[in-house]
Design a protein with these regions (language model features):
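Charged, compositionally biased, marginally structured helical/coil segments
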Residues: 5-155
Length: 155
């Protein structure tokens, strides 16, 4: 695609504008994280031949945050704190483009509501509950924590 793409999502425009700001400010760590995000978005555009909307971009960024959390765990185990710190900086930059994180209370309320709506009673119903919760929390909560919370309530 050439020139200005009218279908470009507002979120992608915001990320691109932030990249330009980081370049002007010569903020290398921030610029690096933003370029990685744009690169992952571009990869989806090429692979799937789509212009991802905001929701799809949030999913991409959320996956990037998850990967970095996993890296931090591994670096922590290997006692490589400086590398863990770099990953944490990237997470902080990526989170600027994600919706406001849910509080534990908001998350618990969403899960309780989904359990009530589905009439879920035990672990067999977990898929139904997650099916309702997932779209509401993507990019706003750590899915492994959400899953653990649902398990504890249904278990």
């Amino acid at each position: 695609s050439t020139g200005i793409n009218m279908a470009e999502s507002p979120l992608k425009q915001k990320i691109t504008a932030s990249m330009k700001d980081a370049m002007r400010a010569k903020d290398k760590p921030r610029l690096g994280a933003i370029r990685l995000a744009l690169s992952d978005i571009k990869q989806v555009e090429v692979d799937e031949r789509i212009d991802p909307d905001d929701a799809r971009i949030i999913t991409i960024l959320d996956k990037m945050v998850k990967q970095r959390r996993e890296s931090i765990r591994q670096y922590g185990a290997a006692e490589r704190q400086e590398l863990a710190d770099l990953e944490q900086q990237e997470i902080e930059v990526l989170q600027e483009f994600l919706p406001q994180a849910l509080s534990e209370i908001e998350l618990a309320e969403l899960i309780e509501k989904a359990i009530t709506e589905t009439g879920a009673e035990n672990m067999k119903d977990m898929g139904k509950v997650m099916g309702i919760v997932r779209p509401q929390v993507v990019g706003r909560a750590d899915m492994s924590a959400v899953s653990a919370e649902v398990k504890s309530l249904l278990g």
